């Protein structure tokens, strides 16, 4: 159920980029997706998430979960009704502005192709590139962690060169290993633990992205940047 759209907003200010809808009985999903990933919109979401850490900003707030182009807000509906909560969230979004995060920088060594990069050849075929070109492009850019999700410590990485964009697999794999380096659409990632996946596996890295005994348990955070460095080249 959509609570807020630009034409329905009761605020004096109207932001045509946002939609707020119910998510269960105690959640609101603020969605700003409007096509390709927009870094400025994502930075506004980060800023809004930081604002919501102030308990005075949103009565009854329980938890926030930042996503790619969206933000899930969990609240106590006994303290604030859904319509009022949506209005507060809309007003806070309107007053937010893009705020870059000074994140950490990581360099991840990886091996492309082989048994643990079984989709490298497929990606090359689909993009019309050689395998060496795929490796060169994938390792030539700096990726930004837009959000964590899907599984504990799983980073949604933006910055994949457009030439490497391929649709997700039609049939997902039920299990791929920890450390699998994957791409799909305009995003990339590296698996923090074994799990199912519908993305294309192009390589493998020694990557410890999640430790339940650590604080914080996830190695990466939104705003962090990373580069993939080829550990071994194809011969």
Language-model features: locations:
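Glycine-rich active-site loops that engage anionic ligands at enzyme catalytic sites
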Residues: 2-235
């Amino acid at each position: 159920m959509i609570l807020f759209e630009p034409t329905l907003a009761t605020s004096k200010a109207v932001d045509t980029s946002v939609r707020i809808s119910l998510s269960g009985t105690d959640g609101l999903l603020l969605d700003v997706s409007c096509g390709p990933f927009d870094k400025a919109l994502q930075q506004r979401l980060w800023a809004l998430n930081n604002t919501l850490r102030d308990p005075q900003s949103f009565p009854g707030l329980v938890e926030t979960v930042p996503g790619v182009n969206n933000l899930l807000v969990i609240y106590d509906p006994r303290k604030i009704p859904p319509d009022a909560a949506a209005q507060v969230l809309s007003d806070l979004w309107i007053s937010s502005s893009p705020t870059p995060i000074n994140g950490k920088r990581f360099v991840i060594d990886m091996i492309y192709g082989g048994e643990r990069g079984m989709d490298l050849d497929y990606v090359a075929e689909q993009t019309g590139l050689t395998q060496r070109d795929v490796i060169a492009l994938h390792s030539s850019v700096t990726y930004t962690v837009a959000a964590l999700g899907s599984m504990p410590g799983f980073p949604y990485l933006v910055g994949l060169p457009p030439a490497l964009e391929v649709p997700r697999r039609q049939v997902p794999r039920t299990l791929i290993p920890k450390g699998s380096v994957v791409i799909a659409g305009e995003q990339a990632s590296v698996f923090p633990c074994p799990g199912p996946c519908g993305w294309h596996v192009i390589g493998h890295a020694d990557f410890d992205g999640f430790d339940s005994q650590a604080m914080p348990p996830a190695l990466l955070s939104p705003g962090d940047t990373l580069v993939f460095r080829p550990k071994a080249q194809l011969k």
